């Protein structure tokens, strides 16, 4: 029974103490190894619970002052163990051995996929329970559902056909966002139809496939890469017509966090500028 208390009850007690400002050291609190979850903790008004972050966690700006405890989904065990947090949160990509080591040390570990709207809802509900902010979590769930319903209603009433899109995550090898990925989900709400329909996740594809599918637009997420200097891209119609869209803040589209709904709205606005109503393909009468 004492062992059960140590592993299940004590971390929660420490966490609540940390969030209420009762701790005098780094003991207690939350380590987030996921940028989306770091953003969610802050959005729910519990930034004071955070004691460390991953190197990929960079928003809001204030979290950059926190110490790092590893890379995205890759904990630095010794550093985390020295911090003695109450809770570590991340997606499911954390090595099970690392997660077990943290649990054996009495640290609660919450791992769950973080890839789409349903996962986001699940994390909001979990954080509401874990961080003792049920009202804030309920409010965020209502906001998320309302934004999704708003986008879906706009799609239903749209006169234009969905634009066929390619999402470039990396250019060499050519990695794209497949079916059921987060870019696929947010793109659909922005009025895009993914040309990659059968492969899930983030598959590697060929330029020959892209030429054959002939997308209307390319959404370019490959930082520091330039298609203009690569002759292989010059035969693609979207490149020839300068319909390659580089999101101003792609992290809002690539992270399943509270900012993704604003990211969808921004993507819709960018597409509207690129494809004015008089040039967009219309739906059949």
What kind of region is each of these model predictions?
Residues 1-9:
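Bacterial N-terminal signal peptides that target proteins for export
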Residues 16-18:
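C-terminal motif of bacterial Sec signal peptides marking the signal peptidase cleavage site
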Residues 21-29, 97-175, 193-198, 242-285:
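Extracytoplasmic substrate-binding proteins
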Residues 29-98, 195-198:
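A short, structured surface patch at a secondary-structure boundary
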Residues 34, 92, 169, 199-202, ...:
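Short secondary-structure boundary segments
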Residues 56-59, 67, 141, 175-202:
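Alpha-helical, coiled-coil/dimerization segments enriched in small aliphatic residues
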Residues 77-84, 104-105, 205-214:
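Short helices/loops that flank or line small-molecule/ion binding pockets
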Residues 94-104, 212, 217-236:
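A ligand-binding cleft/hinge motif common to bilobed small-molecule-binding domains
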């Amino acid at each position: 029974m004492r062992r059960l208390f140590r592993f299940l009850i004590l971390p929660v007690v420490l966490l609540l103490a940390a969030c209420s400002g009762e701790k005098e050291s780094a003991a207690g609190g939350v380590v987030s190894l996921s940028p989306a979850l770091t953003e969610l903790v802050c959005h729910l008004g519990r930034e004071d619970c955070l004691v460390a972050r991953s190197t990929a966690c960079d928003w809001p700006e204030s979290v950059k002052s926190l110490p790092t405890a590893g890379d995205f989904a890759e904990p630095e065990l010794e550093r985390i163990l020295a911090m003695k947090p109450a809770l570590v949160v991340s997606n499911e990509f954390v090595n099970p051995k690392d997660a077990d080591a943290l649990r054996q040390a009495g640290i609660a570990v919450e791992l769950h996929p973080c890839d789409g709207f349903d996962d986001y809802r699940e994390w909001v509900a979990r954080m509401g329970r874990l961080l003792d902010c049920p009202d804030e979590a309920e409010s965020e769930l209502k906001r998320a559902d309302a934004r999704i319903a708003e986008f879906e209603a706009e799609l239903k009433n749209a006169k234009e056909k969905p634009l066929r899109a390619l999402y470039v995550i990396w250019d060499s090898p050519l990695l794209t966002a497949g079916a059921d990925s987060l870019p696929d989900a947010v793109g659909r709400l922005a009025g895009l139809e993914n040309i990659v329909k059968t492969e899930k996740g983030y598959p590697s594809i060929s330029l020959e496939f892209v030429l054959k599918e002939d997308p209307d637009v390319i959404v370019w997420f490959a930082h520091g890469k330039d298609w203009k200097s690569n002759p292989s891209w010059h035969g693609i119609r979207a490149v020839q017509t300068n319909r390659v869209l580089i999101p101003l803040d792609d992290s809002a589209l690539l992270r399943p966090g509270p900012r993704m709904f604003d990211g969808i709205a921004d993507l819709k606005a960018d597409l509207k500028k690129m494809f004015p109503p008089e040039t967009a393909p219309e739906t059949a009468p």
